[in-house]
Every structure is written in C-alpha cells, then in structure tokens.
C-alpha cells in the first residue's frame, strides 16, 4: 500500500506538469473505485489547477470551483503521459490537460478513491485526523501527552491517524527499530525521552523515504514510472528470519493489530 512518502513523491512528481494547466476533460472508465466517483468532479473541466496539496495519504488537486481528492488505496499510482498514450486494463481515470499531457490513475485492486470537495470545504475523509508527521506540531511532548493511560501496543498507536497521519506499516516497523523500541510495548510505558527519540526517527525515516522516491515493494511507481528506492534502506521490514543488521540475531515477525510487524527482540526493548 502506498504510504505517506509514496503519496508525497507522487505529489512532487505531478506538480510541475499540472500546476497552472487547464483541465480539458475528465474521463472515468469505471463508476466506482472504493466509493462511487462523484459526478461533481465534472465541474473541474475547463478549470485551471491552482495548487496540488497533500493531507495524510490524500492528494488534493485544487481549482477555483472545487478540488479533486485522490487516494491511491492498496495498489493505485499516478503517471503523467502524452495525451494520446493508450489506456491499459487498470487505467480508470484520465485528467487531460492543456499542455498535451494526461494524468492517468491506475489501480488494479480498485481500493483507491476520487472524491470532490467544494471550495473552502474539507471532505469528511479529512476530518478528525492528527497532525502531519513532518511538521512542528508532531513532537515528543505531543506524543507523550497523548500516550498517557493508553495500553495499546506502541506500533498500533503511531499508526492511528487520529494521533498522527501517515505513519504506515513499513515506516512504523522501521522507525521503531531505529529507535530500539519494541513494537509490542504498551504506549503508556514509553518515557518522554523515548517518545522524543521515536518521533525523531519517524521524521528521519519518512524524509529519507521521500528523498529516495518512496518504497516499491509491488505496485507503487513514481509519476514518471520509475520505482522508489527506499526498499534498499529497509532494515527489518519484510526480513523475518534474516540476521539483524546490528546484532546478527534473527529478525522476528508478529501480527500486531492484524498487521505484519518486524523487529529484533535483542536490540529492541
């Protein structure tokens, strides 16, 4: 599943091709992805793209009459192509531009979404969510205060979008390993110093992943079709049974909150 770094990489990749371009047409080859594609998106035809933003794992393509809100789901990707490039089997949405390009949305599993938000309004999917992890609002003190009285495993806690957005499964495992914190620990058991360390590693891990173009494990590719290279930086994720890069002990795998979790039981405590 594309996580925050992959969505941010997509935003950075499409922005130079979309910004200040006019949307000539919107083509939908399916009526429904995760949700029904709203007819209001057709309002964006003929409008100039003013800004391409991101909130959590949602891309926001803004015009004067409203915004398209795009979620990549489990297997979605966005590519910028020449407008006459033929569509493939899983190419469900085309946004044709005045510069002769098309923003094409591909999603084999159809778990993604294209939604509409009126000017100045937030869609319901963006309500009641936590701060962005790469902003100053997300710091050790904030997490320490939020953690008080919480017995849930720390890995589940940092993946809760109501606490902080965009810390997905891959980056949660990697950040906890780099912080030397066991993912099964009760959230309330972490000290203020441990929270500061974990927050620092979450920020570093996400930023490095963005700089590396994200993590390509299966479906994700950048806007130009290239893979992300952060997979080469992974230290524990997907490496059960392999030697820990720090101590040589076998990396463990365990289900936490129904998600595969990878850690070193010797290095992390």
UniProtKB/Swiss-Prot annotation:
Q: Which domain of life is it from?
A: Bacteria
Which stretches does the record call FPG-type zinc fingers?
Answer: 235-269
Q: Which InterPro entries does the UniProt entry name for this protein?
A: DNA_glyclase/AP_lyase_DNA-bd, DNA_glyclase_Znf_dom_DNA_BS, Formamido-pyr_DNA_Glyclase, FPG_cat, MutM-like_N-ter, Ribosomal_uS13-like_H2TH, Znf_DNA_glyclase/AP_lyase, Znf_FPG/IleRS
Repressor keyword on record: no
Keyword Transcription set for record: no
- Report any one BP term from Gene Ontology: base-excision repair
Chain positions recorded as DNA binding sites: 90, 109, 150
Give the E.C. number(s): 3.2.2.23, 4.2.99.18
Cofactors (names): Zn(2+)
Pfam family of this protein, just one? Fapy_DNA_glyco
Provide the reaction this enzyme catalyses: Hydrolysis of DNA containing ring-opened 7-methylguanine residues, releasing 2,6-diamino-4-hydroxy-5-(N-methyl)formamidopyrimidine; 2'-deoxyribonucleotide-(2'-deoxyribose 5'-phosphate)-2'-deoxyribonucleotide-DNA = a 3'-end 2'-deoxyribonucleotide-(2,3-dehydro-2,3-deoxyribose 5'-phosphate)-DNA + a 5'-end 5'-phospho-2'-deoxyribonucleoside-DNA + H(+)
Q: Where are the transmembrane segments?
A: none
Q: Drop me one GO molecular function for this one.
A: class I DNA-(apurinic or apyrimidinic site) endonuclease activity
Q: Whom does it interact with, and what assembly results? A: Monomer.
Q: What is this protein called?
A: Formamidopyrimidine-DNA glycosylase
């Amino acid at each position: 599943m594309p996580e925050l770094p992959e969505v941010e990489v997509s935003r950075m990749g499409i922005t130079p091709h979309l910004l200040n371009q006019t949307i000539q047409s919107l083509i939908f080859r399916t009526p429904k992805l995760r949700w029904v594609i709203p007819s209001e998106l057709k309002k964006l035809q003929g409008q100039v793209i003013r800004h391409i933003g991101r909130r959590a794992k949602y891309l926001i393509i803004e015009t004067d009459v409203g915004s398209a809100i795009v979620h990549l789901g489990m297997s979605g990707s966005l590519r910028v192509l020449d407008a006459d490039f033929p569509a493939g089997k899983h190419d469900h949405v085309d946004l044709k531009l005045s510069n002769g390009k098309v923003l094409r949305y591909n999603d084999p599993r159809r778990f993604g979404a294209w939604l509409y938000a009126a000017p100045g309004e937030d869609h319901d999917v963006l309500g009641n969510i936590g701060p962005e992890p790469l902003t100053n609002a997300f710091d050790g003190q904030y997490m320490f205060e939020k953690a008080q009285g919480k017995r849930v495993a720390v890995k589940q806690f940092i993946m809760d979008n109501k606490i902080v957005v965009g810390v997905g499964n891959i980056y949660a495992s990697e950040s906890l390993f780099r912080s030397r914190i066991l993912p099964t620990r009760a959230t309330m058991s972490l000290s203020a110093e441990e929270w500061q360390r974990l927050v620092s590693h979450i920020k570093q891990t996400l930023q490095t992943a963005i700089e590396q173009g994200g993590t390509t494990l299966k479906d994700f590719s950048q806007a130009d079709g290239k893979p992300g290279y952060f997979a080469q930086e992974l230290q524990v994720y997907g490496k059960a049974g392999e030697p820990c890069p720090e101590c040589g002990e076998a990396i463990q795998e365990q289900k936490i909150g129904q998600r595969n979790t990878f850690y070193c039981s010797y290095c992390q405590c």
